[in-house]
């Protein structure tokens, strides 16, 4: 069992928290807003377009910018699994024009509450993330003897100089963890919490 710290309590952070809890880890979610998943409430004009009822391949064909970025994610968790997850959490779904999937209730809040249920078992702490806590790695040991023929010497690729061991909160408190996952979103909607904290980290 690992101590997992997830920075950001939006849709991605709550999904990650639920998955980590199910793998038996101790999970803490750091969320700087009063209410986790707040941006979910404004998606799909307040209805939340959960996914599209299509294959992963069809989905990727409609991604205009850098679809390759989503290959592994959609390969592991295609739209059908997303629908299955929410239906398993008690959300009744419907498919509308353009194969868009919405909750029958037409309320994004239902999706937010479902994700909170999925993340049950994780501790949600209301604090922001100010900095990553880094621990220097010991330098790699040099080989005992250099090869006689310099043509056979392979240039070493530089590795990471440090590893992340936690986060310093805006409150001044430090949160230590074995694994740190940054799921802060971008700068799309600052009033809902998307304030670019991940970029600054």
Map each language-model feature to its residues:
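N-terminal Rossmann-like FAD-binding beta1-loop-alpha1 element of flavoenzymes
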Residues: 2-29
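Conserved Rossmann-like nucleotide-cofactor binding loop
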Residues: 12, 35, 130
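Glycine-rich FAD pyrophosphate-binding loop
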Residues: 21-45
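Short phosphate-binding/catalytic loops that engage adenosine nucleotides
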Residues: 25, 91, 122
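Glycine-rich active-site loop/strand segments that organize a redox cofactor
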Residues: 47-95
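Short beta-strand to alpha-helix junction loop
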Residues: 70-80, 97-117, 189-197
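Short beta-strands and strand-loop turn motifs
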Residues: 93-98, 181-184
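Predominantly flavin-linked oxidoreductase catalytic cores and closely associated redox partners
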Residues: 110, 114-201
């Amino acid at each position: 069992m690992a101590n997992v710290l997830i920075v950001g309590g939006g849709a991605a952070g709550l999904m990650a928290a639920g998955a980590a809890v199910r793998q038996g880890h101790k999970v803490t979610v750091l969320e700087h807003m009063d209410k986790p998943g707040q941006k979910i409430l404004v998606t799909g004009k307040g209805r939340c377009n959960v996914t599209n009822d299509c294959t992963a391949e069809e989905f990727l064909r409609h991604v205009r910018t850098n679809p390759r970025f989503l290959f592994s994610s959609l390969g592991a968790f295609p739209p059908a699994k997303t629908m299955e997850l929410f239906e398993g959490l008690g959300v009744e779904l419907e498919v509308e024009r353009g194969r868009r999937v919405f909750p029958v209730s037409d309320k994004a809040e239902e999706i937010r509450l479902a994700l909170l249920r999925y993340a049950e078992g994780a501790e949600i702490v209301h604090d922001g993330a100010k900095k990553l806590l880094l621990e220097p790695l010991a330098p790699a040991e040099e080989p005992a003897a250099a090869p006689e023929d310099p043509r056979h010497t392979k240039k070493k690729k530089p590795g990471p100089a440090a590893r992340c061991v936690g986060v310093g909160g805006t409150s001044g408190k430090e949160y230590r963890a074995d694994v740190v996952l940054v799921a802060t979103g971008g700068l799309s909607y600052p009033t809902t919490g998307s304030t670019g904290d991940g970029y600054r980290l």
